[in-house]
């Protein structure tokens, strides 16, 4: 089971998941994410996935917008939120889902984005948008 220390939930940390992606044949660091259930509200799905994957709830969320990752051939939408004020609950992974959870310092994750250590489009987009908000004092 993934471990999560209370120090991982500090507001200057980014709760990240590391999991093996079969299509790429490698492990990747990513932000928690998941799929919408039938007729599920995207915001409710974000809250559900955060608790399922990371075993936390959040006091507040900041809407970071919508991402269209593959506009040339797919209509997929990714809804992005930043979660603040994390509180531990319990993790509920799907059958066959294996991932590690860690709270990494914000600046370290941003550096991983800028040096291509993180290449997942939703994570890159979310981190850059949130960095911009932080720079403006809104994060």
Question: What residue spans do the PLM features occupy?
Answer:
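Unchanged
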Residues: 35-121
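Generic C-terminal helix-cap and adjacent flexible tail
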Residues: 132-139
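A conserved beta-turn-beta hairpin within the catalytic core of GNAT-like acetyltransferases
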Residues: 23-29
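C-terminal boundary of histidine-terminating zinc-finger modules
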Residues: 127
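Short, small-residue-biased leader/transition segments that mark boundaries at the very start
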Residues: 1-6
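Structural motif
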Residues: 11-13, 28, 35, 60
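Glycine/small-residue-rich phosphate/adenosyl-binding loop
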Residues: 8-11, 15-18
């Amino acid at each position: 089971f993934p471990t999560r220390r209370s120090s991982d939930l500090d507001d200057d940390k980014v709760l990240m998941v590391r999991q093996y992606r079969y299509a790429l044949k490698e492990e990747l660091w990513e932000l928690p994410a998941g799929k919408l259930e039938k007729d599920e509200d995207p915001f409710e799905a974000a809250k559900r996935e955060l608790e399922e994957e990371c075993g936390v709830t959040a006091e507040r969320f900041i809407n970071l917008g919508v991402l269209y990752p593959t506009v040339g051939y797919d209509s997929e939408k990714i809804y992005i939120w930043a979660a603040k004020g994390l509180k531990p609950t319990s993790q509920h992974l799907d059958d066959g889902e294996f991932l590690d959870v860690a709270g990494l310092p914000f600046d370290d994750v941003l550096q991983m984005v800028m040096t291509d250590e993180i290449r997942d489009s939703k994570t890159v987009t979310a981190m850059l948008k949130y960095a911009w908000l932080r720079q403006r004092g809104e994060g």
